[in-house]
Amino acid sequence: MAKQVVFDETARRALERGIDALANAVRVTLGPKGRNVVLEKKFGAPQIINDGVTIAKEIELENKLENTGAQLIKEVASKTNDVAGDGTTTACVLAQSLVKEGLKNVAAGSNPMNLKRGMEKTVRHLVAELEKVAKPVEGSQAIAQVAAVSAGNDDEIGEMIARAMETVGKEGVITVEESKSLTTELEVTEGMQFDRGYVSPYLVTDQERMEAVFDEPFLLITDKKISIITDLVPILEKVARAGRPLVIIAEDIEKEALATLVVNKLRGVLNVAAVKAPGFGDRRKAMLQDIAVLTDGEVISEDTGIKLENVTTDQLGKARKMTITKDNTTIVAEGNEAAVKARCAQIKQQIEETDSEYDREKLQERLAKLSGGVAVIKVGAATETELKDRKLRIEDAVNATKAAIAEGIVPGGGTALLHLAAGMGGFIDSLSGEEKIGARIIQKALEGPLRQIAENAGLEGSVIAEKVRNLEFNFGFNAMTNEYEDLVAAGIIDPVKVTRSALQNAASIAAMVLTTECIVVDKPEDDKTPAGAGGGGMPDFD
């Protein structure tokens, strides 16, 4: 296919237009008074949403050059979501501000490579400063505040997530699922999560979220390497007759067997997924046994004389729900409390008896996974549209809470970034030449999130930013009440991990845009549809 090649300022301005199109759609959702965005869906009702990364993923521009810019911002949102699970809108606003400020300086004659170096040094400096001012999250009240802010100032959700954290522990598993009722409830059940994902992306059930989600699945748990599909055929037929999904947890599944599973899954013959077993060596066997106890199944192993072709559905594990992503598998089990308690007691005994520090650590890890359970937040709402939006908000809140526990918190509402910008004078003086301009680009862009929060609340962003700049570090603008106050005391707080990821990802993409000198895209094809032929018959006469 023929390519379109665009250079210099034309290329950068095309990227900027694409960045603006996407960022302007996302930025209206920022802050407690942020608005919603309606997404048209090919099937079903439109989706009304307030989640930055979900909006970004939906946007595809007609102009190929501009679409390249939009895809770059999409990358910022997606990467921030992967790392921190929240802060995607802030990342988009920062990236847009950085690109705008940077392009002004490039157009004025600054060298893009020097600007890039200055920006990179400034981001490293700001990340170090964020770590210095971070406060650890202590107590369930602080956890509830972080969760409430991320869920759109919903105190009920904040308290529910704090209760979930108390129950399953800070490292525990919290899942969010849709409820059949109108109310949102918290339920704690047996379950575990391990760090292995699906072996093939073709096995996902939800293409948008790239997850395989199964209700009431059977689990085939084996320490064997499955290399030929004939070993599996008898049990696959039994499961298909039972009409339930099957999740295979095995040492490995080789190409031929996997290809057959994928083909049958795509044809709709089987609802199946496969996951590699967690751990290594003897520890793997022990972890498979843990999963078997949790799900009331058996480990299919040559050691116990059970062959794959002879397995019955009674020997399979049973779960209430399973969610498999590219990195993790979460099992929500049926009530099998007595067996789980007995297994936990056995592991505790091993912890007491072992002399090896390494073994003790690994046994404690297994005990935590098995005994911690899974907290399930069942989201209820009056309509499907509200349910989807509420579920996304709660997922953001869970991620933000975990991020806050990991790296601490800073004042929210864009305040921390603005105060850090105000204190950059000494650092900028330590830089040389055009690197100073790169630092000033970041300094100016750090105002972006606070300005946008104020504008979404119907106020003049620059006036609010100027007032906040002269306040103490913890003090800022509360857009919910339109008051200037101590934001940490008021519970308006952001996780450092979210703020840091947003800044790093935005600066990375902005530096790439500024140093772009050429874009190559597919040339739009001309419409080759032949013109309609003239109608036959007699000509018209006056």
From Swiss-Prot:
InterPro entries xref list: Cpn60/GroEL, Cpn60/GroEL/TCP-1, GroEL-like_apical_dom_sf, GROEL-like_equatorial_sf, TCP-1-like_intermed_sf
GO-annotated cellular components: GroEL-GroES complex
Enzyme kind, highest EC tier: isomerase
GO molecular function, one term: unfolded protein binding
Keyword Cytoplasm: yes
Binding site for ATP: T29, L30, G31, P32, D86, G87, T88, T89, T90, G413, D494
Its biological purpose: Together with its co-chaperonin GroES, plays an essential role in assisting protein folding. The GroEL-GroES system forms a nano-cage that allows encapsulation of the non-native substrate proteins and provides a physical environment optimized to promote and accelerate protein folding.
Protein's UniProt name: Chaperonin GroEL 1
Organism of this sequence: Gloeobacter violaceus (strain ATCC 29082 / PCC 7421)
Gene: groEL1
